[in-house]
Amino acid sequence: MRVSASVKKICRNCKIIRRKGVVRVICTDQRHKQRQG
């Protein structure tokens, strides 16, 4: 899980979603998981 100020899609499988006001990236590649913090 990477925590960054700006989350970006890395590949075409990445999806940007909002959970409880937190912007997250979920992907089939576990290394692409990010959240905004």
From Swiss-Prot:
Q: Which gene encodes it?
A: rpmJ
Drop me one GO molecular function for this one.
structural constituent of ribosome
Q: Which UniProt keywords apply?
A: Ribonucleoprotein, Ribosomal protein
Q: Which family does it belong to?
A: Belongs to the bacterial ribosomal protein bL36 family.
Gene Ontology CC: one annotated term: cytoplasm
The record's Gene Ontology biological-process terms are: translation
Name of the protein described by the UniProt record: Large ribosomal subunit protein bL36
Disulfide linkage: none
Give the NCBIfam families listed for this entry. rpmJ_bact
**PANTHER family, per this entry?**
50S RIBOSOMAL PROTEIN L36, CHLOROPLASTIC, LARGE RIBOSOMAL SUBUNIT PROTEIN BL36C
* KW Ribosomal protein (keyword) present: yes
Query: Taxonomic classification, please?
Result: Bacteria, Pseudomonadati, Pseudomonadota, Betaproteobacteria, Burkholderiales
Q: Which InterPro entries match?
A: Ribosomal_bL36 (IPR000473), Ribosomal_bL36_sp (IPR035977)
Identify the PROSITE patterns for this entry: RIBOSOMAL_L36
- Any Pfam family the entry gives: Ribosomal_L36
